[in-house]
């Protein structure tokens, strides 16, 4: 019997916490396991365990409970603990590949590669955005010396891996052009869906249970409720939509909810906006399948892919979004694109989708067909498998 290839996944985040990058990592793990890979996940102390995944956590840090995306000063010492945990797993398990997710994961993976394996084990970097660009969206880089420091840290990280798996075309371009990585070391592996994930019927009465009229047009947003993820673009667009059609309702899934709830209350739009807080990822289809239109209000600055768009497509929804390279890569002609990253254009396109339900439905059907043909994880993961095979064969020589 052929030996399973062991992959040590270093995940510098509270996995699993029902948010975008976690959904990508979960999708990858599930798809890789179908190709016979044994995945070990080394991650933070918080987050929840999932059946069927080998998740190993650092020691408990009782005062650190943050689950949402975004930087934190606590991560500096937590990532030191992550290194020691990853090193101990490496010594015990002798993995064939180290797969560092996000920049910190690649950095910790690089330390394990060079300090523990002495360069013997290949390191792959799962790139989900630019570190400096993303920190900029969280207003962490207002002081120039700090920006310079993080840019050079990102540059250093990009010298450590043997291969780069990028979550978007933009990420791939950043890695090749800004950090001068050879093109043959870079593959773009767009987020996928497991095509059976949405094979269920909408729950009867679920819309009413959420306080939404059964006949009301429903626009859904899922994801982190953070400025960097575009939530304020959506919230500020809602009054523009309601000024022209008061029958439209909005369903917002995600967390943290406090700032968004406060802003919705200030705008006086609470009667038409329904917030759920954190939702179990495995219940996500129930919410998408009662919706008519999905919205992605993020402006692409950090090169991040948008896993939510893939889920919207998998549920057969028309998608309103800004006109960016990443959104075009996902949706092609199936997107309802708002020009110039302007909030009023986003509002206009949401109204158009409500007022033209037949055309919007056709776009949703196009999206579902496209995701099944192009973005299923079974198809997307083949490039990752090819890279892993190349690296393990090279290591065996």
Q: What are these model-derived regions, one by one?
A:
Residues 8, 165, 213-229, 235-238, ...:
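Conserved donor-binding/catalytic core segment of Leloir-type glycosyltransferases
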Residues 199-212:
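A short helix/loop element that forms part of the nucleotide-sugar donor recognition site in Leloir-type
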Residues 335-344, 352-358:
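Conserved acidic donor-binding segment of nucleotide-sugar-dependent glycosyltransferases
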Residues 1-49:
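N-terminal subdomain of nucleotide-sugar transferases
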Residues 260-285:
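Nucleotide-activated donor-binding/catalytic signature segment of Leloir-type glycosyltransferases, i.e.
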Residues 288-304, 317:
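Acidic donor-binding loop of glycosyltransferase active sites
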Residues 170, 192:
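Carbohydrate-associated surface elements
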Residues 27, 84-91, 107, 114-118, ...:
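Membrane-proximal helix-turn-helix segments that form the acceptor-binding/catalytic region
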């Amino acid at each position: 019997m052929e030996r399973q290839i062991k992959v040590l996944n270093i995940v510098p985040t509270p996995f699993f916490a029902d948010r975008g990058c976690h959904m990508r990592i979960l999708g990858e793990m599930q798809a890789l396991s179908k190709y016979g890979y044994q995945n070990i996940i080394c991650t933070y102390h918080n987050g929840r365990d999932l059946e069927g995944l080998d998740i190993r956590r650092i020691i408990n840090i009782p005062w650190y409970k943050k689950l949402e995306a975004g930087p934190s000063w606590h991560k500096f010492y937590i990532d030191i603990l992550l290194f020691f945990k990853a090193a101990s797993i490496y010594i015990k398990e002798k993995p064939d590949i180290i797969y560092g997710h996000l920049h910190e994961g690649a950095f910790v993976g690089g330390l394990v590669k060079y300090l523990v394996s002495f360069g013997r084990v290949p390191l792959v970097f799962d790139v989900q955005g630019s570190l400096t660009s993303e920190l900029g969206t969280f207003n962490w880089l207002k002081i120039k010396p700090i920006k310079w420091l993080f840019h050079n840290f990102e540059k250093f990280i990009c010298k450590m891996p043997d291969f780069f798996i990028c979550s978007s075309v933009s990420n791939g371009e950043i890695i090749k052009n800004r950090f001068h990585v050879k093109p043959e070391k870079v593959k773009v592996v767009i987020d996928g869906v497991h095509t059976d994930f949405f094979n269920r019927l909408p729950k009867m009465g679920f819309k009413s249970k959420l306080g939404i009229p059964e006949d009301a047009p429903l626009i859904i947003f899922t994801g982190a409720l953070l400025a960097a993820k575009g939530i304020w673009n959506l919230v500020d667009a809602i009054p523009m939509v309601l000024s022209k059609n008061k029958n439209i309702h909005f369903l917002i899934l995600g967390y943290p909810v406090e700032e968004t709830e406060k802003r919705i209350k200030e705008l006086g739009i609470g009667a038409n906006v329904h917030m759920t807080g954190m939702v179990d990822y495995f219940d996500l289809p129930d919410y998408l399948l009662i919706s008519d239109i999905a919205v992605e209000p993020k402006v692409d600055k950090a090169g991040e892919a948008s896993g939510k768009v893939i889920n919207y497509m998998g549920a057969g929804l028309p998608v309103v979004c800004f006109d960016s390279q990443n959104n075009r890569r996902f949706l092609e002609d199936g997107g309802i694109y708002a020009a110039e990253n302007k909030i009023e254009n986003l509002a206009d396109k949401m109204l158009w989708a409500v007022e033209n339900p037949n055309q919007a439905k056709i776009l949703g059907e196009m999206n579902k067909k496209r995701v099944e043909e192009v973005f299923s994880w079974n198809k997307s993961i083949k490039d990752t498998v090819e890279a892993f095979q190349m690296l393990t064969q090279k290591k065996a020589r």
